[in-house]
Structure formats: C-alpha cells, structure tokens
Amino acid sequence: MAISLKTVLCIGCGCFIGGILRYLTGLYISSRWAVVPPHMPWHTLVINFVGCLMMGVCCGLFHKGLVQNPSVQAGLTAGLCGGYSTLAAFAWENAELLRAGAHLTAACYMLATLVGGVLCFMLGYAAAQAVAR
C-alpha cells in the first residue's frame, strides 16, 4: 500500500495541532481539578471524550461527502484526533490508580471512558449527519 507525501504531511500537521491542543487542554483541566492517584484523571477522561466526539463529527462529515479528500480525512482522523486523544495515557493512569490501591476509581475510569467514548462518538456522528442535511 503506497501512501502519498501529501497524506503523510496532512497526518503530521494534524498530529502536531492535536498534540498541542491535548497538552493545553490537560494543563487547563489539571489546574482546576486534582488529577493524581487516587483521584480520577479527569483531564484524560475529558480529552478522550472530546477526541471521540471529534472523531464522530469527522466520520459523519465524511459519510455525507463533505470531506472527500482522503489525505484530509487521514489528517483529521489519524492526525488531529489521534494526536489529541491517547490510549497510552489512559493505560498509564489506570496502572497508577491500581498501584495506588484505588481499584474502584480505576474501574469507574475504565468504564466511564469506554461507555462515554462510544456515546460521544455517536453524538458527534449524529450531529454531523444532522448539520450536513
């Protein structure tokens, strides 16, 4: 499978922007709520919800044909959404919660992320479909 330079650049630019947005969002939320074990890592939970919402909006727009360029699609999904939302931080924070003995908080965080992520994706997709009518 060949990938064009344009696609690589779109993904790279999207990831650059997504990573910066993720960092700034994390700083903002962390400055307002306790986010270290045994507390819920709210910053990553919110970031993952917003990332799923963004992915839903993107996919909804793609399916309506409003964004047809495959390079731009890759830049928005793999790049922007991928750079913004992260499973690695989710895994690390759960490991820290479990090491701290906060088993219930870890379980709630895992469940909230999975259920909330799917719901946010569905909400974003539905919103994009409604707007694109």
Residues covered by each model-derived region:
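Membrane-interface helix-loop junctions in multi-pass transporters/channels
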Residues: M1-R133
